[in-house]
């Protein structure tokens, strides 16, 4: 996302999902 803080949270969330699924 391009919301600044939301970008950080979204990136962490995606990283966790990738870590769990892969």
From Swiss-Prot:
GO terms for cellular component: extracellular region. GO terms for molecular function: oxygen carrier activity. Hemolymph. Coiled coil: none annotated. Keywords: Copper, Oxygen transport, Secreted, Transport. It is found in: Secreted, Extracellular space. Its main location: secreted. Transmembrane segments: none annotated. Disulfide bonds: none annotated. Belongs to the tyrosinase family. Hemocyanin subfamily. Hemocyanins are copper-containing oxygen carriers occurring freely dissolved in the hemolymph of many mollusks and arthropods. This is Hemocyanin subunit 4. It comes from Homarus americanus (American lobster).
